[in-house]
């Protein structure tokens, strides 16, 4: 710009758009729906224009009494891909009707913890229990049988099979169940009906159940994964970076679905690098640093200053 050039900056990250632009054009559905001078608009107005409706001002999170423990992690140790310690004596408890938010800078053991919970990595020590039943490590199917829903951070790599149809992804974890199969023969009508119901219930924008999953937008890919994982009414939900790379409308939708699971009675472990998300959704917040829990705070009493100090690796309690 300083050299006299014009710059077109394309992004759905509204804070960045507001910080560097002089004029803003909003696209929705392939059409220009609004133009604004940056000084004369706000992130709230732009967000509403992007989704074509008024977004909720605040997340409506009901006060709920946490129930019994549904996820217990005890003395968990693990190595990273370089065979260096990634998790060190990690202990966590998640209860019914509760969202436990895990904050931390990327690369402090979050990915390794997610992979262990998803059955993709073995720890070197420790026990994980779901509803008081020990989890068999290295077995994704074991986690599914114990009613754990898994929302991995990379929906295109570990969350979905991109070259399969939407329908195939929706029934992926249950395709061999009695609901969808008899004597090796697929129950096509039942599968079609279930897929159509999930597409409708989760507002998945697609040309149909036979559409190739790769053709969907990021927000709709996340909805497919949510529909598959939450359809079975899980006892535990592991949500790892659930809104990464999504626009504001999709983020709001995902947040509402997570809160609905909390109200239904599930225990949710929310692993996120987005502090706004952690503060908005969590009943309790823990901070992970170099594979260890630095501190814990109740969601309503947590301060950004305290969480930030713990995220930097300083074990210091801020005076309220």
Question: Residue ranges of each PLM-predicted region?
Answer:
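Glycine-rich phosphate-binding loops of nucleotide-dependent enzymes
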Residues: 1-320
């Amino acid at each position: 710009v300083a050299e006299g050039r014009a710059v077109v900056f394309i992004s759905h990250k509204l804070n960045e758009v507001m910080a560097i632009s002089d004029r803003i054009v909003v696209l929705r559905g392939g059409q220009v729906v609004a133009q604004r001078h940056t000084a004369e608009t706000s992130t709230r107005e732009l967000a509403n224009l992007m989704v074509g409706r008024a977004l909720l001002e605040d997340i409506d999170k009901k006060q709920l009494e946490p129930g019994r423990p549904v996820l217990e992690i005890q003395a968990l140790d693990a190595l990273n891909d370089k065979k260096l310690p990634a998790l060190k004596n990690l202990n966590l408890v998640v209860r019914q009707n509760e969202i436990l938010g895990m904050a931390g800078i990327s690369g402090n053991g979050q990915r390794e913890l997610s992979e262990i919970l998803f059955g993709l990595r073995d720890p070197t020590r420790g026990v994980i229990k779901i509803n008081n039943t020990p989890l068999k490590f290295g077995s994704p199917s074991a986690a599914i049988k114990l009613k754990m829903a898994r929302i991995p951070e990379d929906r295109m790599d570990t969350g979905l099979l991109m070259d399969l149809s939407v329908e195939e992804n929706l029934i992926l974890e249950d395709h061999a169940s009695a609901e969808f199969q008899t004597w090796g023969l697929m129950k096509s009508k039942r599968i079609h009906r279930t897929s159509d119901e999930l597409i409708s219930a989760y507002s998945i924008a697609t040309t149909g159940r036979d559409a190739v999953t790769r053709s969907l937008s990021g927000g709709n890919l996340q909805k497919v994964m949510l529909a598959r994982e939450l359809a079975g009414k899980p006892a535990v939900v592991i949500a790892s970076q659930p809104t990464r790379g999504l626009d504001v409308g999709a983020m709001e939708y995902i947040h509402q679905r997570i809160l609905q699971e909390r109200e239904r009675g599930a225990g949710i472990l929310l692993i996120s690098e987005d502090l706004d998300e952690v503060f908005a959704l969590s009943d309790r917040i823990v901070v992970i640093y170099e594979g260890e829990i630095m501190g814990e705070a109740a969601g309503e009493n947590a301060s950004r200053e305290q969480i930030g100090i713990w995220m930097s690796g300083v074990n210091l309690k801020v005076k309220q």
